[in-house]
Design a protein with these regions (language model features):
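Metal-dependent peptidase/peptidase-like ectodomains
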Residues: 115, 177-268, 288
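PDZ-domain C-terminal substructure recognizer with occasional recognition of PDZ-binding tails
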Residues: 367, 382-410
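PDZ/PDZ-like groove recognition
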Residues: 317-362
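Alpha-helical metal-binding/catalytic segments enriched in His/Glu/Asp
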Residues: 108, 118-126, 130-184, 298-299
Length: 410
């Protein structure tokens, strides 16, 4: 017997009463959705918990209110079970006989009687009270995950609100994934057990951490090399003068990877790392809701533009993570992944780690580590790969335009 209630089909009634949502309406809904999903009452939405079930039920209710149709295996829900391996070096596997951790994807559909379908997704799970994925050092605390990823989940609902009222040349499948924090479990399960024919999928859009658009309006978009159609379209619809920072690879630490590995074009939208990432301080009041709406509107314009083109060609990309060096030490910083200047800019510093002990701060730009010149993230990682625990080296960084050097011990 299911421990969540099945949502009734009231979509047709809701649709009949709707009008095109205004910016004010959308911002109010974004705030409402993020505030609910990131509330303490949901206890961090960890997969397999009551908080995750409540979040899934909430998204099913939102989809129903908006007027999109259920497309799970049980109404809006697609339940899945993964078993955790006893060996930490082995991957989790789909469980049998109900053993393991059970989660649920929430899936809705807009059927425009089109030949092609666009998948739009965002994960709604988070870390619960922390665990191995947390960067928090201290007593156990609820990790509300407002940016990661209540922001993307709220954006998912906002796009459904916009697209349900417009007759487009594509169908739309909306998926709120669970189990992303555990290793893309929900999206992995979906692509192996799809509720539509994957041959009809044109491309997939993933929104993960889109709630912290900065003053420069910097928006990272990963996967632009997975179809030749993406880059021209992304530039064409950038009427808000967003500062786009792009990468080609379709592989990354979020749910778009599962679809890329099925030979589908993918895009991952991301407004950047911050010092609240995977910490209890990632709360709803820190979300830039106007910026979140800008991301939603931008994606809506992109979808409209790509709807004017034939089915997108898929291009395999070089896996940037495959070339990443292996390293056994850490500086203890959160890099600013949106920084496009020379060096590696620090977006956060972990307590009691080598960087903090050496005096480095948020905003410092690392330009040299040992004998290695740091020009970007890859050169920074290569430099780290040369060191072993216990070794010392000089680190050079820029602060307020001045070069500073310090001794760092790993």
């Amino acid at each position: 017997m299911k421990h969540y209630q099945v949502i009734g089909l009231i979509g047709a009634l809701a649709f009949a009463c709707q009008s095109v949502p205004s910016d004010t309406d959308l911002i109010n809904d974004l705030k409402k959705d993020v505030t609910y999903l990131a509330a303490d009452q949901l206890e961090g939405r960890a997969i397999g918990t009551d908080g995750e079930v409540k979040a899934a039920e909430y998204m099913a209710e939102r989809f129903s209110e908006i007027g999109i149709s259920p497309k799970g295996t049980d109404g809006f829900f697609q339940e899945f079970t993964f078993s955790k391996p006893s060996n930490p070096h082995e991957e989790a596997v789909i469980g049998t006989d109900g053993e393991g951790v059970t989660g649920r994807n929430v899936i809705g559909f807009i059927d425009n009687q089109a030949a092609q379908t666009i998948v739009i997704g965002a994960h709604f799970d988070h870390l619960g009270y922390g665990g191995s994925g947390s960067l928090h050092r201290g007593d156990s605390a609820i990790h509300n995950g407002a940016d990661d990823n209540a922001s993307g989940t709220a954006a998912l609902a906002a796009l459904a609100e916009l697209l349900v009222d417009e007759k487009r040349q594509s169908n739309f499948l909306f998926i709120a994934f669970s189990g992303e924090e555990n290793g893309l479990w929900g999206s992995n399960y979906f692509v192996k057990n799809p509720t539509i024919d994957l041959e009809t999928v044109n491309y997939m859009i993933n929104m993960d951490m889109v709630g912290r658009l900065n003053e420069e309006k910097t928006l990272a978009i990963n996967g632009v090399g997975t179809s030749p159609s993406f880059v021209p379209a992304l530039d064409l619809v950038n009427s808000d003068s967003l500062k786009l920072v792009t990468s080609e690879s379709g592989v990354g630490p979020s749910d778009h990877t599962s679809f890329y590995l099925q030979d589908l074009p993918v895009l991952h939208f991301f407004t950047g790392q911050h010092e609240d990432y995977h910490r209890p301080s990632d709360d709803s009041e820190k979300i830039n809701y106007e910026g979140l709406l800008q991301v939603v509107r931008y994606i809506d314009r992109l979808i409209a533009q790509l709807d004017t083109e034939p089915k997108l060609a898929f291009t395999k990309t070089k896996d940037s993570s495959g070339d990443s060096p292996r390293f056994t030490v850490t500086l203890g910083v959160v890099p600013d992944y949106l920084y496009d200047g020379q060096g590696m800019r620090i977006d956060g510093v972990s307590e009691d780690k080598p960087a903090q002990k050496a005096g480095l701060q948020k905003g410092d730009i690392v330009v040299q580590l040992g004998d290695s010149t740091i020009v970007d993230m890859m050169s920074y990682m290569r430099a780290l790969g040369a060191f072993q625990p216990g070794q010392e080296t000089q680190v050079a960084y820029e602060r307020d335009g001045k070069r500073v050097e310090a001794l760092v011990k790993f």
